[in-house]
């Protein structure tokens, strides 16, 4: 919904940056993944620094996206790795994530970075089955450092 109003989207990001946790909102940081060779925005990652009741149930600490033309090239693994580094800087030890059961690309990305499936349930709001994962941040970063820090 913010694609039509870039300035409004940036304003929302700024509000989320400074927001105190509540039942409906949590402090959030948004980062872009930019390819060095051509300065093209490849993707983004949204990191929620705290979780409220709703985000513990669906959503978790991280949401991400890769430009459709750049999918299936390994960029989201880099995106998630860098996001986990930011989580570590903020003292987040365990990251909770979820994805649609049929989003195999996202599930593979989460699993590649050490995500362990903790449960699966149906989301009535979105009418889909959701898989939930937990990632030990320190363990993931340690295991993947040589692969993603070149």
Residue ranges and their predicted role:
Residues 97-107:
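Conserved beta-strand-loop-alpha-helix junction that forms the acyl-donor binding cleft
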Residues 63-66, 72-85, 108-112:
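Conserved acetyl-CoA-binding loop-helix of GNAT-fold acetyltransferases
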Residues 1-61, 86, 128-150:
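GNAT-family acyltransferases
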Residues 98-99, 114-132:
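Conserved catalytic-core motifs of GNAT/GCN5-like acyltransferases
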Residues 33, 92, 120-123:
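Catalytic cores of nucleotide-sugar-dependent glycosyltransferases that transfer UDP/GDP/TDP-activated
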Residues 39, 74, 91, 103:
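Conserved G/P- and acidic residue-centered "switch" motifs that form tight phosphate/ATP-binding loops
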Residues 87-98:
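Conserved GNAT acetyl-CoA-binding A-motif
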């Amino acid at each position: 919904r913010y694609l039509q109003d870039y300035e409004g989207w940036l304003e929302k990001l700024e509000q989320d940056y400074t927001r105190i946790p509540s039942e409906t909102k949590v402090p959030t940081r948004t980062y872009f993944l930019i390819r060095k060779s051509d300065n093209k925005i490849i993707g983004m990652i949204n990191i929620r620094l705290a979780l409220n009741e709703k985000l513990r149930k669906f959503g978790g600490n991280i949401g991400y996206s890769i430009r459709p033309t750049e999918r299936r090239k390994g960029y989201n693994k880099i995106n998630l790795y860098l996001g986990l580094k930011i989580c570590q800087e903020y003292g987040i030890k365990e990251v909770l994530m979820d994805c649609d059961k049929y989003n195999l690309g996202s599930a593979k990305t989460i699993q590649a970075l050490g995500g362990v499936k903790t449960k699966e349930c149906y989301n009535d709001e979105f009418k889909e089955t959701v898989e939930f994962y937990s990632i030990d941040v320190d363990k993931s970063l340690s295991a993947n450092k040589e692969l993603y820090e070149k």
